[in-house]
């Protein structure tokens, strides 16, 4: 008999119940922590960095709770067997130790890993895809805002949403959303300006075509006929019609290129009318359309000349220490447009994946631009809502009458450009994810791009406040940014239909 007084049966029962409760609590805590939706919710509420710290603290608490619980359970079993034969006690205690040790090891193994930024990114991408197409308007278009019931539909927003949904979706999503996607494309087709030279205005009733809107329409249509998607989005008999639409947009874009190689916001041609955003979207359109291989009416020579001239204009108008600015013709400037610079670099990276345009995309100013961008000091501290807007003086197009002997490209009324906001976060994320695979830069710079990609992805939870303003263009551009994931040594050249 033991020399120690044996606790009362009631005390032993209470001790056993407490041990079991503690073990259940620890196990429940780890099970709950392993649910991705709960992790996503917590990340939304407190942010990725705070959640990582919380995870470390909770892991320590859970481990301590499990150790105490299983130690207490072992001691409880010992107390219950205190009066039994020594051989029985030894056998039962040995079995209990084996079982409890196994449970302890298993429980430790089940402790959830730290929050995964890529898993969170995938969750947000799905949420944003569904949000963009959740409430289609009667005309099939996407409204400028998801928070205002009376918000108008807009081709610009619709095209951005289509591109975003298409490049971010897996097959199951595309099948589920295919009908809505087709309806949105029909809205774009029905909203064209019928008078020459055509195109799309800021809203349906606006009769001046805008280059960047045509560019977005083009990259959306090109995404829909990508070889991995076309059979899901379109019926076989519809595919040729979509290629005809792409051909029409390409012809429009090519016909409105300025003599200096850039593009202006409208079809009007004239000195100093080229703008960076217009040129970026027009060049991107041509790159994506060329890649589809489904526009035989547009010869390679036309693509080569237009894209080469567009890229050359962009690289020529890069400004050291500033990057790209919306209107390079304004002489004295000291404002950095990080979002615009990131988007230009992203488009140059797309050009670089094609053997047709690799040499021009890596021409003068390309490497300095990439190096300066990767060295930008404010990626970690800049608020996601701290975005640059077009300067007031850059919104007004100066109308210059062409010489009598020079045919005008269109009869264009005075025009005011929309005061666009250039979102820095999504395009910076897209750019660094591409730069991480760029073989034209040094290995240390690729590593820096990879580190920036992880750091920016870790800040994705900060997007909620900006997303919740309700503007669908923000949702679309963020969705494009988080969906860029170019494989190593990607070489995407002209495909086959």
Which residue ranges define each predicted feature?
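Hydrophobic, helix-forming membrane-interacting segments
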Residues: 2-82, 89-110
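Buried hydrophobic core positions in alpha-solenoid tandem helical repeats
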Residues: 128-132, 184, 188-189, 250-254, ...
């Amino acid at each position: 008999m033991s020399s120690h007084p044996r606790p009362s049966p009631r005390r032993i029962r209470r001790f056993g119940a407490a041990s079991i409760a503690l073990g259940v609590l620890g196990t429940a805590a780890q099970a709950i922590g392993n649910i991705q939706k709960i992790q996503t919710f917590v990340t939304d509420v407190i942010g990725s960095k705070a959640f990582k710290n919380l995870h470390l603290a909770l892991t320590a608490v859970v481990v301590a709770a499990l150790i105490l619980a299983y130690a207490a359970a072992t001691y409880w079993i010992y107390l219950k067997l205190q009066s039994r034969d020594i051989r029985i006690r030894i056998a039962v205690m040995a079995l209990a130790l084996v079982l409890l040790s196994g449970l302890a090891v298993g429980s430790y193994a089940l402790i959830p890993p730290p929050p995964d930024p890529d898993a969170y990114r995938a969750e947000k991408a799905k949420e944003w895809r569904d949000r963009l197409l959740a409430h289609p308007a009667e005309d099939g278009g996407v409204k400028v805002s998801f928070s205002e019931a009376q918000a108008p539909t807009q081709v610009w927003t619709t095209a951005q949403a289509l591109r975003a949904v298409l490049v971010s979706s897996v097959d199951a999503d595309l099948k589920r959303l295919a009908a809505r996607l087709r309806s949105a494309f029909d809205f774009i087709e029905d909203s064209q300006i019928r008078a020459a030279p055509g195109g799309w205005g800021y809203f349906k009733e606006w009769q001046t075509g805008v280059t960047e809107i045509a560019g977005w329409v083009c990259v959306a249509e090109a995404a829909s006929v990508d070889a991995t998607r076309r059979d899901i989005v379109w019926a076989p008999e519809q595919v040729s019609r979509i290629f005809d639409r792409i051909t029409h947009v390409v012809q429009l874009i090519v016909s409105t290129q300025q003599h200096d190689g850039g593009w202006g916001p409208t079809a009007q041609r004239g000195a100093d009318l080229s703008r960076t955003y217009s040129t970026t979207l027009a060049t991107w359109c041509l790159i994506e359309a060329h890649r589809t291989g489904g526009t035989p009416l547009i010869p390679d020579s036309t693509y080569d000349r237009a894209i080469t001239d567009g890229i050359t204009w962009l690289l020529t108008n890069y400004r050291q220490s500033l990057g790209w600015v919306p209107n390079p013709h304004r002489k004295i400037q000291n404002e950095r447009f990080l979002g615009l610079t990131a988007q230009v670099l992203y488009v140059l990276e797309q050009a670089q994946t094609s053997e047709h345009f690799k040499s021009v995309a890596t021409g003068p100013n390309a490497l300095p631009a990439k190096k300066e961008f990767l060295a930008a000091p404010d990626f970690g501290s800049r608020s996601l809502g701290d975005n640059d807007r077009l300067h007031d003086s850059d919104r007004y197009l100066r109308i210059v009458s062409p010489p009598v002997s020079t045919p005008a490209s269109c009869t264009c009324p005075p025009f005011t450009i929309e005061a666009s906001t250039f979102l820095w976060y999504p395009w910076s994320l897209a750019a660094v994810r591409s730069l991480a695979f760029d073989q034209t830069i040094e290995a240390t710079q690729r590593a820096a791009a990879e580190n920036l990609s992880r750091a920016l992805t870790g800040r994705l939870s900060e997007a909620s406040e900006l997303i919740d303003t309700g503007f669908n263009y923000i949702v679309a551009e963020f969705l494009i940014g988080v969906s860029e994931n170019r494989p190593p040594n990607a070489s995407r050249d002209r495909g086959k239909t």
